[in-house]
Amino acid sequence: MKLRWFAFLVVLLAGCSSKQDYKNPPWNAEVPVKRAMQWMPISEKAGEAWGVSPRLITAIIAIESGGNPTVVSKSGAVGLMQLKASTSGRDVYRHMGWSGEPSTSELKNPERNISMGTAYLSILEHGSLAGINDPQVMQYALVVSYANGAGALLRTFSSDRKKAIEKINDLSADEFFEHVAKNHPAPQAPRYIWKLQQALDAM
């Protein structure tokens, strides 16, 4: 009996500590945000065109690339907002009525990258995430969906999009974050929200 109780405590403590894993390793937003701020004129232009907050765009640039326009991830995400040509890039092209997908050189162009990344945020906001009422919850939902897909997020609430949105609208921003930390299949999802807040606070 004592052994079983000890095992239960180990599992419980492990679960509690895992909720804080999103803060590890530590991330100082000051330098990435400073580098991302140099692209603010482009971010403001793109934000105005697509109805997206330039501060949100800048925060995503800080998180995704640290302001480096030429960085390419191991998974093939490119540039300031780390867009994948075959997924988010293709979605933006389709939305614009274009065929194909952006090239690597196009995605390394700061203005094109920010424009397409901002367009993708707008597509998410007015598409899969349409109907979320709370602005901060929408912001959190946007960055989680930007990083890991809207479908993965919505399925943590319901397989039915309408029901998922209704459940999201029952939550405060803090409750939404807690739900993501507990239920999202991607461990980096709550960390992204945490990084977003760090970046916004550093501006």
Curated annotation (Swiss-Prot):
Signal peptide positions on this chain: 1-15
Keyword Signal tagged: yes
GO molecular function terms listed in the Swiss-Prot or TrEMBL record: lytic endotransglycosylase activity
Pfam families on file: SLT (PF01464)
SUPFAM superfamilies per UniProt: Lysozyme-like (SSF53955)
Keywords noted in UniProt: Cell outer membrane, Cell wall biogenesis/degradation, Lipoprotein, Lyase, Membrane, Palmitate, Signal
Bilayer disposition of the protein: Lipid-anchor
Family in the record: Belongs to the transglycosylase Slt family.
Role of this protein: Murein-degrading enzyme. May play a role in recycling of muropeptides during cell elongation and/or cell division. Preferentially cleaves at a distance of more than two disaccharide units from the ends of the glycan chain.
NCBIfam families: PRK15470.1
Name the record gives this protein: Endo-type membrane-bound lytic murein transglycosylase A
